């Protein structure tokens, strides 16, 4: 024991190994380094065996069974703190905007094809939901749509004649009637399709214009309407004048014809009279 105390007294400036290990660990983990307490070279108090044994117990890994944070060595505690900080830094999540954004556009700004696609998707989704509800036994309502409004705008005359009804007549007449009916139905379908396409195009063109352009178009239409009405009035007046002139001319011509006929008859009578008188005069000297 005395030899051991003499060794410690002989090297008072040498720090204990536990302090060296703790300084290394604190330097690696980024914790502030604490300067060790200066030892008095004059030999104030040498290290006692109790302190040395305590430091040796802390240096031994797994002292006290290795259970609990208080029973661990300073190196183990420092490593645990470093691992916890690294785990927190690794788990830190920064929210970033999604790369795939859905740009919503109002229905009025969509083109006709995009409107058709959206309506088709909505109808398919509604049909799928209705099928799921029907499979679960829940009451299902009809799909809500505004197509009936468009149908009411162009009402068609009902077909009072049933398709299976037979008409009296020959087979040729029935075939001709069927072909005429099919051609009429095809023509009506084409006319309706053209009207719908024209209405869609006109609606899209109006929706794409500003308020000033719409006002300017409205004033232009009013000006053209007034010009058309004035032209129609002038044509009606001209037609009335042309219809009145031929009648008047016909009456004048008829009167002229009647006057000429009367004059011709008078001249004919005078000619006959002069011929008779000339014949009489020619017969007297010869007798």
From Swiss-Prot:
Segments of skewed composition (Basic residues): 89-105
Region annotation (Interaction with P-TEFb) ranges: 142-145
Compositional bias annotation for Basic and acidic residues: 115-134, 181-212, 266-280
Residues with PTM Phosphoserine: 31, 53, 55, 73, 78, 83
Keywords associated with the record: Coiled coil, Nucleus, Phosphoprotein, Repressor, Transcription, Transcription regulation
PANTHER family: HEXAMETHYLENE BISACETAMIDE INDUCIBLE 1, PROTEIN HEXIM2
Recorded family membership: Belongs to the HEXIM family.
Protein name: Protein HEXIM2
Organism field: Bos taurus
Gene: HEXIM2
């Amino acid at each position: 024991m005395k030899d051991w105390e003499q060794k410690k007294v002989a090297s008072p400036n040498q720090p204990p190994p536990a302090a060296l290990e703790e300084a290394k660990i604190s330097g690696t983990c980024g914790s502030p380094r604490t300067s060790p307490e200066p030892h008095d070279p004059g030999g104030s108090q040498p290290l006692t065996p109790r302190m040395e044994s305590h430091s040796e117990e802390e240096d031994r890994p797994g002292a006290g069974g290795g259970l609990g944070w208080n029973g661990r060595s300073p190196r183990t505690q420092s490593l645990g703190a470093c691992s916890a900080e690294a785990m927190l830094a690794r788990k830190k999540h920064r929210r970033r905007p999604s790369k795939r954004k859905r740009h919503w556009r109002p229905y009025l700004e969509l083109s006709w094809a995009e409107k058709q696609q959206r309506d088709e998707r909505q109808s398919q989704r509604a049909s799928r939901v209705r099928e799921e509800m029907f499979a679960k036994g829940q009451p299902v309502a009809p799909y809500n749509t505004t197509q009936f409004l468009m149908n009411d705008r162009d009402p068609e005359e009902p077909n009072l004649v049933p398709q299976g009804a037979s008409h009296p007549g020959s087979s040729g007449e029935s075939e001709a009637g069927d072909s005429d009916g099919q051609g009429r139905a095809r023509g009506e379908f084409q006319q309706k399709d053209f009207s719908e396409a024209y209405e869609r195009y006109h609606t899209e063109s109006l929706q794409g214009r500003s308020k000033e352009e719409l006002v300017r178009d409205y004033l232009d239409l009013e000006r053209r309407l007034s010009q058309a009405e004035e032209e129609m009035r002038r044509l009606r007046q001209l037609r009335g004048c042309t219809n009145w002139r031929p009648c008047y001319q016909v009456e004048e011509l008829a009167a002229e014809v009647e006057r000429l006929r009367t004059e011709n008859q008078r001249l004919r009578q005078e000619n006959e009279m002069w011929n008779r008188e000339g014949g009489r005069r020619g017969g007297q000297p010869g007798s």
